[in-house]
Swiss-Prot record:
Annotated GST C-terminal domain residues: 50-173
InterPro entries, per the entry: AIMP3/p18_C, Arc1-like_N, EEF1E1, Glutathione-S-Trfase_C-like, Glutathione-S-Trfase_C_sf
The protein's name: Eukaryotic translation elongation factor 1 epsilon-1
Coiled coil: 153-169
Modified residues (N6-acetyllysine): 138
Gene name per UniProt: EEF1E1
Cellular component, GO, one term: aminoacyl-tRNA synthetase multienzyme complex
Tissue/organ expression: Down-regulated in various cancer tissues.
Spans annotated as C-terminal: 64-152
Record organism: Homo sapiens
GO biological process: cellular response to leukemia inhibitory factor; negative regulation of cell population proliferation; positive regulation of apoptotic process; positive regulation of apoptotic signaling pathway; positive regulation of cellular senescence; positive regulation of DNA damage response, signal transduction by p53 class mediator; translation
Pfam family, one: Arc1p_N_like
Keywords (A to Z) from UniProt: Acetylation, Coiled coil, Cytoplasm, Nucleus, Protein biosynthesis
Compartments in which it is found: Cytoplasm; Cytoplasm, Cytosol; Nucleus
Assembly, per entry: Part of a multisubunit complex that groups tRNA ligases for Arg (RARS1), Asp (DARS1), Gln (QARS1), Ile (IARS1), Leu (LARS1), Lys (KARS1), Met (MARS1) the bifunctional ligase for Glu and Pro (EPRS1) and the auxiliary subunits AIMP1/p43, AIMP2/p38 and EEF1E1/p18. Can interact simultaneously with MARS1 and EPRS1. Forms a linear complex that contains MARS1, EEF1E1, EPRS1 and AIMP2 that is at the core of the multisubunit complex. Interacts with ATM and ATR.
Length: 174
């Protein structure tokens, strides 16, 4: 999904009126937002943080210094690790790492829903939608997290719902 489409989804989920126009610059199509009263903003996470502040929902950026750092870490991860990686091996490595990380967490920061969850959900959607039932079970923690985020009010919108089976079909023993 193009960054402009993600930012439009984010705007809608934040309850903002669709007044922003996005363009893309460079070979990698980095999103650009021209603000009404200042310089243009460049980059998915920069623009997303601006939209969160515009919607007066700063809690999505983290409530403590540690949580803010974790949100920033996962936003950076989204841009550096998820975007631009489309080989099946890259994605499975990413899902394996994320699965381990989410083992004891509800959300990326632990117990609070943040912008990092939203943007990572949008970034992973195109990959998760193509996983087999067996792959979804292999990455059980990612599947749990993803299913939880897609059912969070206002997040999924027009994106296809990914079906997860509640009872495991496969066991880890071979």
């Amino acid at each position: 999904m193009a960054a402009a489409a993600e930012l439009s989804l984010l705007e809608k989920s934040l309850g903002l009126s669709k007044g922003n126009k996005y363009s893309a610059q460079g070979e990698r199509q980095i999103p650009v937002l021209q603000t009404n009263n200042g310089p243009s903003l460049t980059g998915l996470t920069t623009i997303a943080a601006h939209l969160v502040k515009q919607a007066n929902k700063e809690y999505l950026l983290g409530s403590t210094a540690e949580e803010k750092a974790i949100v920033q870490q996962w936003l950076e991860y989204r841009v550096t690790q998820v975007d631009g990686h489309s080989s099946k091996n890259d994605i499975h490595t990413l899902l394996k790492d994320l699965n381990s990380y989410l083992e004891d967490k509800v959300y990326l920061t632990g117990y609070n829903f943040t912008l990092a969850d939203i943007l990572l959900y949008y970034g992973l959607h195109r990959f998760i939608v193509d996983l087999t039932v067996q792959e979804k079970e292999k990455y059980l923690n990612v599947s749990r997290w993803f299913c939880h985020i897609q059912h969070y009010p206002g997040i999924r919108q027009h994106l296809s719902s990914v079906v997860f089976i509640k009872n495991r079909l496969y066991t880890n023993s071979h």
